[in-house]
């Protein structure tokens, strides 16, 4: 088996497994208090992002594209309740960027929630939103998401990229786990996950 076929088979298997276990993405309201309500949105956002890239790059076969569309539809309609869970999350933590970051790939795939978008636009105008303390790569990601949404980034990407590990270009032999994660995400944010 060649490497391309192996990678394809792993991807197909992963997508089929996710589809078969899609009910596992539900958001229980009586979650363990040690796990934040908004933190549980992240896997749903990752799912939407992965499916968006699959569609954009045209790398999924017709069966995989159908499964991916069904996964996204399920996540939007059942897990996020048509965006209402994101609105609830934004109301619970108005300064959290998580509902916005989860929403954007769904919006780019054609889903919308006017109520969520109103909340995101309102919060975007707050000075507290721009003043949130976060790592440079996290700030770069948020600025990229704001640009993709059509909002002027509160902190321009060009002003942030130089503060990232990759932007500072230190000694490459010092890369370790967290740094490698930050490097890959710097590239992801600058290339829209390309």
Describe the role of every protein-language-model region.
Residues 6, 10, 14, 43-46, ...:
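Structural recognition of alpha-solenoid helical scaffolds
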Residues 51, 55-58, 110, 194:
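Helix-turn/linker elements and helix-coil junctions of extended alpha-helical scaffolds
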Residues 1-53, 61, 69-73:
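Low-complexity, Ser/Thr/Pro/Gly-enriched N-terminal "stalk/linker" regions
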Residues 76-194:
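Eukaryote-skewed repeat-based solenoidal scaffolds used as protein-protein interaction platforms
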Residues 54-90:
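Post-signal peptide N-terminal segment of secreted/secretory-pathway proteins
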């Amino acid at each position: 088996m060649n490497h391309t076929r192996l990678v394809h088979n792993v991807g197909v298997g992963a997508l089929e497994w996710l589809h078969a276990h899609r009910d596992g993405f539900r958001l229980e309201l009586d979650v363990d208090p040690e796990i934040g309500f908004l933190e549980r949105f992240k896997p749903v956002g990752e799912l939407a992002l992965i499916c968006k890239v699959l569609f954009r790059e045209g790398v999924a076969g017709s069966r995989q594209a159908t499964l991916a569309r069904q996964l996204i539809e399920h996540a939007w309609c059942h897990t996020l309740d048509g965006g209402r869970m994101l609105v609830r999350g934004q109301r619970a933590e108005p300064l959290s960027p998580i509902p916005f970051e989860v929403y954007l790939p769904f919006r780019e795939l054609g889903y919308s929630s006017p109520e969520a978008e109103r909340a995101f636009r309102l919060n975007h105008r707050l000075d507290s939103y721009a003043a949130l303390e976060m790592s440079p790569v996290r700030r770069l990601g948020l600025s990229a998401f704001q640009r993709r949404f059509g909002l002027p980034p509160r902190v321009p990407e060009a002003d942030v990229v130089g503060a990232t590990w990759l932007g500072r270009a230190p000694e490459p032999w010092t890369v370790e786990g967290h740094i490698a994660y930050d490097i890959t995400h710097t590239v992801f944010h600058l290339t829209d996950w390309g």
